[in-house]
Protein backbone atom coordinates (compact mmCIF):
# COMPACT_ATOMS: atom_id res chain seq x y z
CA UNK A 1 0.00 0.00 0.00
CA UNK A 2 1.45 3.30 -1.05
CA UNK A 3 1.16 6.36 1.14
CA UNK A 4 0.56 9.96 0.31
CA UNK A 5 -2.36 9.60 -2.08
CA UNK A 6 -2.91 12.02 -4.94
CA UNK A 7 -5.82 14.42 -5.10
CA UNK A 8 -8.87 12.32 -5.89
CA UNK A 9 -10.50 13.07 -9.19
CA UNK A 10 -13.68 11.58 -10.56
CA UNK A 11 -14.45 13.61 -13.68
CA UNK A 12 -18.07 13.34 -14.73
CA UNK A 13 -18.84 10.73 -12.11
CA UNK A 14 -18.50 12.45 -8.78
CA UNK A 15 -16.64 11.12 -5.75
CA UNK A 16 -17.04 7.69 -4.25
CA UNK A 17 -18.29 8.14 -0.67
CA UNK A 18 -18.74 5.54 2.06
CA UNK A 19 -20.68 6.10 5.28
CA UNK A 20 -19.77 3.72 8.11
CA UNK A 21 -22.76 3.21 10.40
CA UNK A 22 -26.48 3.35 9.64
CA UNK A 23 -27.66 5.25 12.72
CA UNK A 24 -29.39 8.63 12.51
CA UNK A 25 -26.06 10.43 11.85
CA UNK A 26 -25.14 8.11 8.97
CA UNK A 27 -28.65 8.11 7.52
CA UNK A 28 -28.86 11.89 7.79
CA UNK A 29 -25.55 12.31 5.97
CA UNK A 30 -26.61 9.83 3.27
CA UNK A 31 -30.01 11.42 2.71
CA UNK A 32 -28.47 14.87 2.37
CA UNK A 33 -25.76 13.69 -0.03
CA UNK A 34 -28.17 11.66 -2.17
CA UNK A 35 -30.12 14.81 -2.96
CA UNK A 36 -27.08 16.24 -4.74
CA UNK A 37 -26.32 14.88 -8.23
CA UNK A 38 -22.56 14.78 -7.57
CA UNK A 39 -22.96 12.00 -4.99
CA UNK A 40 -24.40 9.09 -6.94
CA UNK A 41 -21.58 6.76 -5.81
CA UNK A 42 -22.60 6.42 -2.17
CA UNK A 43 -22.84 3.39 0.12
CA UNK A 44 -23.78 3.09 3.80
CA UNK A 45 -22.07 0.13 5.49
CA UNK A 46 -24.12 -1.02 8.50
CA UNK A 47 -22.72 -3.71 10.80
CA UNK A 48 -26.10 -5.15 11.81
CA UNK A 49 -29.22 -6.32 9.99
CA UNK A 50 -31.15 -3.12 10.72
CA UNK A 51 -30.77 0.64 10.39
CA UNK A 52 -31.29 3.13 13.20
CA UNK A 53 -28.38 2.41 15.53
CA UNK A 54 -29.39 3.59 18.99
CA UNK A 55 -32.88 4.31 17.66
CA UNK A 56 -34.55 0.94 18.10
CA UNK A 57 -38.31 0.42 18.35
CA UNK A 58 -39.63 -3.07 19.04
CA UNK A 59 -43.09 -4.55 18.68
CA UNK A 60 -43.75 -6.12 22.05
CA UNK A 61 -46.52 -6.45 24.65
CA UNK A 62 -49.05 -5.79 21.89
CA UNK A 63 -47.59 -2.36 21.10
CA UNK A 64 -44.36 -0.52 20.29
CA UNK A 65 -41.66 0.14 22.88
CA UNK A 66 -38.45 2.13 22.54
CA UNK A 67 -35.44 -0.02 23.40
CA UNK A 68 -33.21 2.89 22.40
CA UNK A 69 -33.93 6.62 22.02
CA UNK A 70 -37.15 7.46 23.85
CA UNK A 71 -38.01 11.15 23.53
CA UNK A 72 -37.45 14.07 21.19
CA UNK A 73 -35.67 16.38 23.61
CA UNK A 74 -36.80 19.93 22.99
CA UNK A 75 -39.43 19.34 20.27
CA UNK A 76 -39.56 22.80 18.68
CA UNK A 77 -38.70 24.51 15.40
CA UNK A 78 -34.98 24.61 16.21
CA UNK A 79 -34.84 20.82 16.47
CA UNK A 80 -34.22 19.03 13.15
CA UNK A 81 -35.54 15.70 14.46
CA UNK A 82 -38.80 17.42 15.39
CA UNK A 83 -38.91 19.12 11.98
CA UNK A 84 -38.43 15.84 10.12
CA UNK A 85 -40.88 13.94 12.34
CA UNK A 86 -43.52 16.64 11.76
CA UNK A 87 -42.84 16.63 8.02
CA UNK A 88 -43.29 12.85 7.87
CA UNK A 89 -46.50 12.97 9.95
CA UNK A 90 -45.06 10.90 12.80
CA UNK A 91 -46.14 13.00 15.80
CA UNK A 92 -49.35 13.43 17.76
CA UNK A 93 -51.46 16.57 17.91
CA UNK A 94 -50.23 17.61 21.35
CA UNK A 95 -46.54 17.40 20.37
CA UNK A 96 -47.21 19.52 17.29
CA UNK A 97 -49.08 22.23 19.20
CA UNK A 98 -47.43 25.62 19.53
CA UNK A 99 -48.13 25.49 23.26
CA UNK A 100 -46.05 22.31 23.65
CA UNK A 101 -43.20 23.78 21.60
CA UNK A 102 -42.96 26.85 23.82
CA UNK A 103 -42.68 25.05 27.17
CA UNK A 104 -39.31 25.64 28.86
CA UNK A 105 -38.30 22.61 30.95
CA UNK A 106 -34.67 23.57 31.45
CA UNK A 107 -33.93 19.99 30.45
CA UNK A 108 -35.11 18.79 33.87
CA UNK A 109 -37.16 15.65 34.46
CA UNK A 110 -40.70 16.31 35.67
CA UNK A 111 -42.00 15.43 39.14
CA UNK A 112 -43.29 11.91 39.80
CA UNK A 113 -46.98 11.09 40.11
CA UNK A 114 -46.23 8.94 43.14
CA UNK A 115 -43.10 8.32 45.20
CA UNK A 116 -42.54 5.07 47.09
CA UNK A 117 -39.98 4.59 49.85
CA UNK A 118 -38.13 1.35 50.50
CA UNK A 119 -39.98 0.96 53.82
CA UNK A 120 -43.22 0.50 51.89
CA UNK A 121 -44.79 3.91 52.47
CA UNK A 122 -45.57 6.74 50.09
CA UNK A 123 -43.30 9.77 50.24
CA UNK A 124 -44.90 13.21 50.48
CA UNK A 125 -44.94 14.73 47.00
CA UNK A 126 -44.50 18.14 48.64
CA UNK A 127 -41.21 16.95 50.09
CA UNK A 128 -40.20 15.49 46.71
CA UNK A 129 -41.04 18.82 45.03
CA UNK A 130 -39.01 20.73 47.63
CA UNK A 131 -35.94 18.56 47.04
CA UNK A 132 -36.38 18.64 43.25
CA UNK A 133 -36.54 22.44 43.39
CA UNK A 134 -33.30 22.53 45.38
CA UNK A 135 -31.56 19.98 43.16
CA UNK A 136 -32.46 21.56 39.83
CA UNK A 137 -31.67 25.07 41.06
CA UNK A 138 -28.18 23.77 41.85
CA UNK A 139 -27.98 22.11 38.42
CA UNK A 140 -28.90 25.46 36.86
CA UNK A 141 -26.19 27.20 38.88
CA UNK A 142 -23.52 25.02 37.26
CA UNK A 143 -23.83 27.25 34.18
CA UNK A 144 -21.99 29.95 36.11
CA UNK A 145 -18.79 27.97 35.60
CA UNK A 146 -19.08 27.76 31.82
CA UNK A 147 -16.29 30.22 31.03
CA UNK A 148 -14.10 29.18 33.97
CA UNK A 149 -10.66 27.93 32.96
CA UNK A 150 -10.56 25.74 36.04
CA UNK A 151 -13.08 24.85 38.72
CA UNK A 152 -12.90 23.71 42.30
CA UNK A 153 -14.37 21.19 42.63
CA UNK A 154 -13.77 19.70 39.16
CA UNK A 155 -16.99 17.67 38.87
CA UNK A 156 -20.72 18.36 38.85
CA UNK A 157 -21.24 15.73 41.56
CA UNK A 158 -18.75 17.23 43.98
CA UNK A 159 -20.19 20.71 43.42
CA UNK A 160 -23.74 19.48 44.10
CA UNK A 161 -22.68 17.68 47.28
CA UNK A 162 -20.81 20.74 48.53
CA UNK A 163 -23.91 22.91 48.05
CA UNK A 164 -26.24 20.32 49.61
CA UNK A 165 -24.06 20.23 52.75
CA UNK A 166 -24.41 24.01 52.98
CA UNK A 167 -28.20 23.80 52.63
CA UNK A 168 -28.39 21.04 55.26
CA UNK A 169 -27.14 23.48 57.87
CA UNK A 170 -30.48 25.26 57.58
CA UNK A 171 -32.67 22.15 57.80
CA UNK A 172 -34.70 22.17 61.03
CA UNK A 173 -36.68 18.92 60.69
CA UNK A 174 -36.19 15.77 62.76
CA UNK A 175 -33.40 13.38 61.83
CA UNK A 176 -35.75 10.96 60.06
CA UNK A 177 -37.04 13.68 57.73
CA UNK A 178 -33.51 14.92 57.02
CA UNK A 179 -32.52 11.37 56.13
CA UNK A 180 -35.52 11.08 53.80
CA UNK A 181 -34.59 14.37 52.13
CA UNK A 182 -31.12 13.00 51.41
CA UNK A 183 -32.62 9.77 50.06
CA UNK A 184 -34.81 11.77 47.66
CA UNK A 185 -31.76 13.75 46.57
CA UNK A 186 -29.89 10.49 45.97
CA UNK A 187 -32.70 9.45 43.61
CA UNK A 188 -32.34 12.77 41.76
CA UNK A 189 -28.57 12.20 41.45
CA UNK A 190 -29.38 8.83 39.87
CA UNK A 191 -31.89 10.49 37.53
CA UNK A 192 -29.16 12.89 36.43
CA UNK A 193 -26.85 9.90 35.84
CA UNK A 194 -29.47 8.52 33.43
CA UNK A 195 -29.80 11.90 31.72
CA UNK A 196 -26.02 12.27 31.38
CA UNK A 197 -25.32 8.63 30.59
CA UNK A 198 -22.77 8.26 33.38
CA UNK A 199 -22.14 6.05 36.40
CA UNK A 200 -21.68 9.00 38.74
CA UNK A 201 -22.00 12.77 38.51
CA UNK A 202 -18.51 12.82 40.07
CA UNK A 203 -17.27 11.77 36.61
CA UNK A 204 -18.95 14.71 34.81
CA UNK A 205 -16.84 17.85 34.35
CA UNK A 206 -18.26 20.98 35.98
CA UNK A 207 -16.87 23.78 33.79
CA UNK A 208 -18.22 22.55 30.41
CA UNK A 209 -21.47 21.08 31.83
CA UNK A 210 -23.49 24.18 30.97
CA UNK A 211 -22.35 24.09 27.35
CA UNK A 212 -24.99 21.45 26.61
CA UNK A 213 -27.87 23.37 25.05
CA UNK A 214 -31.48 22.71 26.00
CA UNK A 215 -34.07 23.47 23.33
CA UNK A 216 -37.60 24.64 24.20
CA UNK A 217 -40.50 22.21 24.07
CA UNK A 218 -41.91 19.52 26.35
CA UNK A 219 -40.20 16.23 25.46
CA UNK A 220 -42.44 14.06 23.29
CA UNK A 221 -42.51 10.52 21.92
CA UNK A 222 -43.42 8.90 18.61
CA UNK A 223 -46.87 7.23 18.89
CA UNK A 224 -45.87 4.51 16.40
CA UNK A 225 -42.20 4.32 17.37
CA UNK A 226 -39.04 6.39 16.90
CA UNK A 227 -37.91 4.00 14.18
CA UNK A 228 -40.60 5.46 11.94
CA UNK A 229 -38.21 8.38 11.50
CA UNK A 230 -35.30 6.23 10.32
CA UNK A 231 -37.69 4.18 8.16
CA UNK A 232 -38.81 7.37 6.39
CA UNK A 233 -35.22 8.48 5.83
CA UNK A 234 -34.36 5.00 4.51
CA UNK A 235 -37.31 5.10 2.12
CA UNK A 236 -35.93 8.31 0.58
CA UNK A 237 -32.58 6.67 -0.29
CA UNK A 238 -31.88 4.84 -3.57
CA UNK A 239 -32.40 1.13 -2.99
CA UNK A 240 -28.75 0.09 -3.40
CA UNK A 241 -27.30 2.61 -0.93
CA UNK A 242 -27.69 0.55 2.27
CA UNK A 243 -25.45 -2.49 2.78
CA UNK A 244 -26.45 -4.49 5.88
CA UNK A 245 -24.55 -7.08 7.94
CA UNK A 246 -21.29 -5.48 6.84
CA UNK A 247 -19.17 -4.74 9.94
CA UNK A 248 -16.04 -2.75 9.18
CA UNK A 249 -12.71 -4.10 10.43
CA UNK A 250 -10.22 -1.40 9.42
CA UNK A 251 -10.30 1.96 7.65
CA UNK A 252 -7.08 2.37 5.65
CA UNK A 253 -6.48 6.04 4.86
CA UNK A 254 -3.80 8.31 3.45
CA UNK A 255 -3.00 5.64 0.90
CA UNK A 256 -3.19 5.02 -2.83
CA UNK A 257 -5.57 2.18 -3.59
CA UNK A 258 -6.69 0.81 -6.93
CA UNK A 259 -9.67 -1.17 -8.14
CA UNK A 260 -9.91 -3.41 -11.20
CA UNK A 261 -13.18 -1.80 -12.31
CA UNK A 262 -11.58 1.66 -12.31
CA UNK A 263 -8.22 1.28 -14.09
CA UNK A 264 -5.95 4.27 -13.83
CA UNK A 265 -7.80 5.71 -10.84
CA UNK A 266 -6.48 5.72 -7.29
CA UNK A 267 -8.41 6.18 -4.06
CA UNK A 268 -6.95 7.56 -0.80
CA UNK A 269 -9.22 5.40 1.40
CA UNK A 270 -9.91 1.66 1.56
CA UNK A 271 -12.55 0.31 3.94
CA UNK A 272 -11.84 -3.31 4.87
CA UNK A 273 -14.77 -5.32 6.26
CA UNK A 274 -14.78 -8.26 8.66
CA UNK A 275 -15.85 -10.63 5.85
CA UNK A 276 -12.88 -9.64 3.69
CA UNK A 277 -14.75 -7.32 1.33
CA UNK A 278 -12.91 -4.08 0.57
CA UNK A 279 -14.41 -0.80 -0.62
CA UNK A 280 -12.12 1.91 -2.06
CA UNK A 281 -13.37 5.48 -1.72
CA UNK A 282 -12.45 9.11 -2.04
CA UNK A 283 -14.13 9.93 1.28
CA UNK A 284 -15.47 7.98 4.25
CA UNK A 285 -17.85 9.42 6.85
CA UNK A 286 -17.39 7.50 10.12
CA UNK A 287 -20.45 7.60 12.39
CA UNK A 288 -19.77 4.73 14.82
CA UNK A 289 -20.57 5.28 18.53
CA UNK A 290 -17.81 6.57 20.79
CA UNK A 291 -18.02 3.35 22.83
CA UNK A 292 -17.03 1.35 19.74
CA UNK A 293 -14.14 3.75 19.08
CA UNK A 294 -12.87 3.29 22.63
CA UNK A 295 -12.98 -0.50 22.31
CA UNK A 296 -11.34 -0.73 18.85
CA UNK A 297 -9.05 2.30 18.85
CA UNK A 298 -5.90 0.27 18.15
CA UNK A 299 -7.21 -1.62 15.11
CA UNK A 300 -9.93 0.45 13.47
CA UNK A 301 -7.65 2.90 11.63
CA UNK A 302 -4.51 2.29 9.61
CA UNK A 303 -2.40 4.35 9.95
CA UNK A 304 -3.49 5.03 13.55
CA UNK A 305 -5.34 8.24 14.33
CA UNK A 306 -3.30 11.32 15.27
CA UNK A 307 -2.46 11.54 18.97
CA UNK A 308 -4.74 14.54 19.49
CA UNK A 309 -7.78 12.63 18.23
CA UNK A 310 -6.86 9.48 20.19
CA UNK A 311 -6.64 11.55 23.37
CA UNK A 312 -10.04 13.11 22.68
CA UNK A 313 -11.62 9.67 22.24
CA UNK A 314 -10.09 8.48 25.50
CA UNK A 315 -11.07 11.57 27.49
CA UNK A 316 -14.71 12.07 26.46
CA UNK A 317 -17.05 10.09 28.69
CA UNK A 318 -19.34 7.34 27.38
CA UNK A 319 -21.63 5.49 29.78
CA UNK A 320 -24.62 3.19 29.90
CA UNK A 321 -28.30 3.93 30.48
CA UNK A 322 -30.61 0.95 30.11
CA UNK A 323 -34.35 0.37 30.20
CA UNK A 324 -36.29 -2.47 31.77
CA UNK A 325 -39.88 -2.94 30.59
CA UNK A 326 -42.30 -4.81 32.86
CA UNK A 327 -45.65 -6.02 31.52
CA UNK A 328 -48.61 -6.41 33.89
CA UNK A 329 -51.99 -7.97 33.30
CA UNK A 330 -53.61 -5.30 35.48
CA UNK A 331 -52.08 -1.99 36.61
CA UNK A 332 -51.38 -1.52 40.32
CA UNK A 333 -51.04 2.23 39.72
CA UNK A 334 -53.74 4.89 39.40
CA UNK A 335 -55.15 5.71 35.91
CA UNK A 336 -53.58 9.19 35.88
CA UNK A 337 -50.16 7.96 37.07
CA UNK A 338 -47.33 8.76 34.65
CA UNK A 339 -44.14 8.38 36.68
CA UNK A 340 -43.36 6.24 39.75
CA UNK A 341 -40.34 7.28 41.81
CA UNK A 342 -38.48 4.77 44.01
CA UNK A 343 -36.57 6.16 47.02
CA UNK A 344 -34.16 4.03 49.06
CA UNK A 345 -34.16 5.44 52.58
CA UNK A 346 -30.70 4.08 53.42
CA UNK A 347 -29.08 5.96 50.52
CA UNK A 348 -27.51 9.43 50.55
CA UNK A 349 -25.61 11.39 47.89
CA UNK A 350 -23.16 12.47 50.58
CA UNK A 351 -21.93 8.94 51.26
CA UNK A 352 -19.36 7.64 48.77
CA UNK A 353 -19.83 3.90 48.85
CA UNK A 354 -18.68 1.32 46.34
CA UNK A 355 -21.60 -0.03 44.30
CA UNK A 356 -23.03 -3.26 45.73
CA UNK A 357 -23.58 -4.86 42.37
CA UNK A 358 -24.44 -8.41 43.36
CA UNK A 359 -26.92 -7.65 46.13
CA UNK A 360 -28.15 -4.13 45.46
CA UNK A 361 -27.73 -3.26 41.75
CA UNK A 362 -31.46 -2.45 41.61
CA UNK A 363 -31.05 0.48 44.02
CA UNK A 364 -29.68 2.51 41.10
CA UNK A 365 -33.06 2.14 39.32
CA UNK A 366 -34.67 5.60 39.40
CA UNK A 367 -38.26 4.41 39.08
CA UNK A 368 -40.70 3.71 36.28
CA UNK A 369 -42.51 5.61 33.55
CA UNK A 370 -46.02 4.40 32.71
CA UNK A 371 -46.38 3.70 28.99
CA UNK A 372 -49.72 4.41 27.29
CA UNK A 373 -51.83 1.25 27.79
CA UNK A 374 -51.63 -1.34 25.03
CA UNK A 375 -54.54 -3.45 23.87
CA UNK A 376 -54.22 -6.21 26.43
CA UNK A 377 -51.37 -5.20 28.71
CA UNK A 378 -50.00 -2.46 30.92
CA UNK A 379 -46.29 -1.66 30.80
CA UNK A 380 -43.83 0.15 33.05
CA UNK A 381 -40.45 1.34 31.77
CA UNK A 382 -37.66 1.57 34.33
CA UNK A 383 -34.35 3.39 33.81
CA UNK A 384 -30.98 2.46 35.31
CA UNK A 385 -27.52 3.88 34.56
CA UNK A 386 -23.89 3.18 35.31
CA UNK A 387 -22.03 0.13 36.55
CA UNK A 388 -25.23 -1.26 38.08
CA UNK A 389 -26.85 -1.04 34.67
CA UNK A 390 -23.93 -2.87 33.08
CA UNK A 391 -24.06 -5.53 35.81
CA UNK A 392 -27.78 -5.98 35.16
CA UNK A 393 -26.91 -6.95 31.58
CA UNK A 394 -24.96 -9.95 32.87
CA UNK A 395 -27.95 -11.37 34.76
CA UNK A 396 -30.59 -13.71 33.37
CA UNK A 397 -34.07 -12.43 32.54
CA UNK A 398 -35.38 -14.54 35.43
CA UNK A 399 -32.98 -12.93 37.92
CA UNK A 400 -33.86 -9.39 36.81
CA UNK A 401 -37.59 -10.11 36.88
CA UNK A 402 -37.33 -11.70 40.33
CA UNK A 403 -35.36 -8.76 41.75
CA UNK A 404 -37.72 -6.12 40.39
CA UNK A 405 -40.79 -8.03 41.55
CA UNK A 406 -39.30 -8.00 45.06
CA UNK A 407 -38.53 -4.28 44.76
CA UNK A 408 -42.10 -3.43 43.71
CA UNK A 409 -43.62 -5.57 46.46
CA UNK A 410 -41.35 -3.91 49.00
CA UNK A 411 -41.88 -0.29 48.02
CA UNK A 412 -45.65 -0.58 47.55
CA UNK A 413 -45.97 -2.38 50.87
CA UNK A 414 -47.91 -5.14 49.12
CA UNK A 415 -46.20 -8.55 49.41
CA UNK A 416 -49.01 -10.06 47.31
CA UNK A 417 -48.47 -7.74 44.34
CA UNK A 418 -48.74 -9.94 41.21
CA UNK A 419 -45.42 -10.46 39.45
CA UNK A 420 -45.02 -8.90 36.01
CA UNK A 421 -46.23 -11.14 33.20
CA UNK A 422 -43.10 -10.60 31.11
CA UNK A 423 -40.05 -8.43 30.75
CA UNK A 424 -37.92 -6.82 28.04
CA UNK A 425 -34.67 -4.93 28.59
CA UNK A 426 -31.98 -3.12 26.68
CA UNK A 427 -28.34 -4.18 26.95
CA UNK A 428 -26.44 -1.32 25.34
CA UNK A 429 -23.11 -1.92 27.06
CA UNK A 430 -22.77 -5.46 25.73
CA UNK A 431 -24.03 -4.51 22.24
CA UNK A 432 -20.80 -5.07 20.25
CA UNK A 433 -21.19 -2.14 17.85
CA UNK A 434 -22.30 0.36 20.52
CA UNK A 435 -20.62 -0.52 23.86
CA UNK A 436 -22.76 1.91 25.85
CA UNK A 437 -25.47 4.52 25.43
CA UNK A 438 -24.20 8.05 24.83
CA UNK A 439 -21.46 10.54 25.58
CA UNK A 440 -20.84 13.13 28.29
CA UNK A 441 -18.04 15.60 28.98
CA UNK A 442 -15.97 13.79 31.59
CA UNK A 443 -13.64 15.31 34.18
CA UNK A 444 -10.40 16.06 32.34
CA UNK A 445 -12.15 16.73 29.04
CA UNK A 446 -14.00 19.66 27.49
CA UNK A 447 -16.06 20.62 24.48
CA UNK A 448 -12.75 21.11 22.67
CA UNK A 449 -12.32 17.33 22.70
CA UNK A 450 -15.64 16.89 20.91
CA UNK A 451 -14.49 19.41 18.32
CA UNK A 452 -11.23 17.49 17.93
CA UNK A 453 -13.16 14.26 17.43
CA UNK A 454 -15.23 15.98 14.73
CA UNK A 455 -12.20 17.23 12.76
CA UNK A 456 -11.70 15.44 9.42
CA UNK A 457 -8.45 13.76 8.37
CA UNK A 458 -5.85 14.43 7.24
CA UNK A 459 -5.87 17.51 9.42
CA UNK A 460 -3.90 19.44 6.81
CA UNK A 461 -6.04 18.09 3.97
CA UNK A 462 -6.64 20.52 1.14
CA UNK A 463 -9.23 20.15 -1.58
CA UNK A 464 -10.39 16.63 -2.35
CA UNK A 465 -7.62 15.18 -0.18
CA UNK A 466 -10.16 15.33 2.65
CA UNK A 467 -10.43 11.61 3.39
CA UNK A 468 -11.97 10.63 6.74
CA UNK A 469 -14.86 12.61 8.20
CA UNK A 470 -16.48 12.06 11.61
CA UNK A 471 -20.12 12.34 12.71
CA UNK A 472 -22.28 11.09 15.57
CA UNK A 473 -23.71 12.55 18.77
CA UNK A 474 -20.30 12.60 20.49
CA UNK A 475 -19.00 15.00 17.81
CA UNK A 476 -21.58 17.71 18.56
CA UNK A 477 -20.31 20.16 21.16
CA UNK A 478 -23.68 21.43 22.41
CA UNK A 479 -26.16 18.66 21.51
CA UNK A 480 -24.09 15.58 22.45
CA UNK A 481 -26.10 12.54 23.68
CA UNK A 482 -29.17 13.46 21.57
CA UNK A 483 -30.66 12.26 18.30
CA UNK A 484 -30.83 15.84 17.03
CA UNK A 485 -27.13 16.27 17.79
CA UNK A 486 -26.40 13.09 15.85
CA UNK A 487 -28.56 14.16 12.89
CA UNK A 488 -27.01 17.63 12.76
CA UNK A 489 -23.52 16.10 12.82
CA UNK A 490 -24.40 13.94 9.81
CA UNK A 491 -25.70 17.00 7.98
CA UNK A 492 -22.53 18.90 8.94
CA UNK A 493 -20.26 16.34 7.29
CA UNK A 494 -22.51 16.04 4.23
CA UNK A 495 -22.35 19.82 3.89
CA UNK A 496 -18.58 19.67 4.20
CA UNK A 497 -18.40 17.29 1.23
CA UNK A 498 -20.93 19.23 -0.82
CA UNK A 499 -18.99 22.44 -0.25
CA UNK A 500 -15.86 20.62 -1.36
CA UNK A 501 -17.29 19.29 -4.62
CA UNK A 502 -19.82 22.01 -5.38
CA UNK A 503 -19.13 25.30 -3.58
CA UNK A 504 -22.32 26.79 -5.06
CA UNK A 505 -24.55 23.96 -3.75
CA UNK A 506 -28.01 24.90 -2.53
CA UNK A 507 -28.67 23.26 0.83
CA UNK A 508 -31.80 21.06 0.83
CA UNK A 509 -32.55 21.66 4.53
CA UNK A 510 -31.97 24.62 6.87
CA UNK A 511 -28.42 24.54 8.21
CA UNK A 512 -29.18 24.69 11.92
Swiss-Prot record:
<dbReference type="GO" id="GO:0046203">
    <property type="term" value="P:spermidine catabolic process"/>
</dbReference>
<feature type="modified residue" description="N-acetylmethionine">
    <location>
        <position position="1"/>
    </location>
</feature>
<keyword id="KW-0560">Oxidoreductase</keyword>
<feature type="binding site">
    <location>
        <position position="195"/>
    </location>
    <ligand>
        <name>substrate</name>
    </ligand>
</feature>
<feature type="binding site">
    <location>
        <begin position="482"/>
        <end position="483"/>
    </location>
    <ligand>
        <name>FAD</name>
    </ligand>
</feature>
<keyword id="KW-0576">Peroxisome</keyword>
<comment type="function">
    <text>Flavoenzyme which catalyzes the oxidation of N(1)-acetylspermine to spermidine and is thus involved in the polyamine back-conversion. Can also oxidize N(1)-acetylspermidine to putrescine. Substrate specificity: N(1)-acetylspermine = N(1)-acetylspermidine &gt; N(1),N(12)-diacylspermine &gt;&gt; spermine. Does not oxidize spermidine. Plays an important role in the regulation of polyamine intracellular concentration.</text>
</comment>
<feature type="binding site">
    <location>
        <position position="321"/>
    </location>
    <ligand>
        <name>substrate</name>
    </ligand>
</feature>
<feature type="short sequence motif" description="Microbody targeting signal">
    <location>
        <begin position="510"/>
        <end position="512"/>
    </location>
</feature>
<feature type="binding site">
    <location>
        <position position="248"/>
    </location>
    <ligand>
        <name>FAD</name>
    </ligand>
</feature>
<keyword id="KW-0274">FAD</keyword>
<dbReference type="GO" id="GO:0046592">
    <property type="term" value="F:polyamine oxidase activity"/>
</dbReference>
<dbReference type="GO" id="GO:0008215">
    <property type="term" value="P:spermine metabolic process"/>
</dbReference>
<comment type="subunit">
    <text>Monomer.</text>
</comment>
<dbReference type="InterPro" id="IPR036188">
    <property type="entry name" value="FAD/NAD-bd_sf"/>
</dbReference>
<dbReference type="GO" id="GO:0005737">
    <property type="term" value="C:cytoplasm"/>
</dbReference>
<feature type="binding site">
    <location>
        <position position="54"/>
    </location>
    <ligand>
        <name>FAD</name>
    </ligand>
</feature>
<dbReference type="GO" id="GO:0052903">
    <property type="term" value="F:N(1)-acetylpolyamine oxidase (3-acetamidopropanal-forming) activity"/>
</dbReference>
<comment type="similarity">
    <text>Belongs to the flavin monoamine oxidase family.</text>
</comment>
<comment type="pathway">
    <text>Amine and polyamine metabolism; spermine metabolism.</text>
</comment>
<keyword id="KW-0007">Acetylation</keyword>
<keyword id="KW-0285">Flavoprotein</keyword>
<feature type="binding site">
    <location>
        <position position="73"/>
    </location>
    <ligand>
        <name>substrate</name>
    </ligand>
</feature>
<dbReference type="InterPro" id="IPR002937">
    <property type="entry name" value="Amino_oxidase"/>
</dbReference>
<dbReference type="InterPro" id="IPR050281">
    <property type="entry name" value="Flavin_monoamine_oxidase"/>
</dbReference>
<keyword id="KW-0963">Cytoplasm</keyword>
<feature type="propeptide">
    <location>
        <begin position="1"/>
        <end position="6"/>
    </location>
</feature>
<dbReference type="Pfam" id="PF01593">
    <property type="entry name" value="Amino_oxidase"/>
</dbReference>
<protein>
    <recommendedName>
        <fullName>Peroxisomal N(1)-acetyl-spermine/spermidine oxidase</fullName>
        <ecNumber>1.5.3.13</ecNumber>
    </recommendedName>
</protein>
<feature type="binding site">
    <location>
        <position position="473"/>
    </location>
    <ligand>
        <name>FAD</name>
    </ligand>
</feature>
<feature type="binding site">
    <location>
        <position position="46"/>
    </location>
    <ligand>
        <name>FAD</name>
    </ligand>
</feature>
<feature type="binding site">
    <location>
        <begin position="70"/>
        <end position="71"/>
    </location>
    <ligand>
        <name>FAD</name>
    </ligand>
</feature>
<dbReference type="GO" id="GO:0005777">
    <property type="term" value="C:peroxisome"/>
</dbReference>
<feature type="binding site">
    <location>
        <position position="25"/>
    </location>
    <ligand>
        <name>FAD</name>
    </ligand>
</feature>
Amino acid sequence: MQSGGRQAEAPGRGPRVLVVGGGIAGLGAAQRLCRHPAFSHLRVLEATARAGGRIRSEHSFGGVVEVGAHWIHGPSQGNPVFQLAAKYGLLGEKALSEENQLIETGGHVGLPSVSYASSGVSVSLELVAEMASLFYSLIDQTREFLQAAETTPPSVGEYLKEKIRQHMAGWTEDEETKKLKLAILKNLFNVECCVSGTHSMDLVALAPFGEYTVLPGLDCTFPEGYQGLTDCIMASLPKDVMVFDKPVKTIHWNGSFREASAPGETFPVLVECEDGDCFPAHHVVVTVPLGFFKKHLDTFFEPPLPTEKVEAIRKIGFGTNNKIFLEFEEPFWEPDCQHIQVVWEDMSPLEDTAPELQDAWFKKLIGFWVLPPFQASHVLCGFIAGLESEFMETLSDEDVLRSLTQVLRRVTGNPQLPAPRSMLRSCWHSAPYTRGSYSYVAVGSSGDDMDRLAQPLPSDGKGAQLQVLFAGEATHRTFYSTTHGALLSGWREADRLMTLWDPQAQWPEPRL
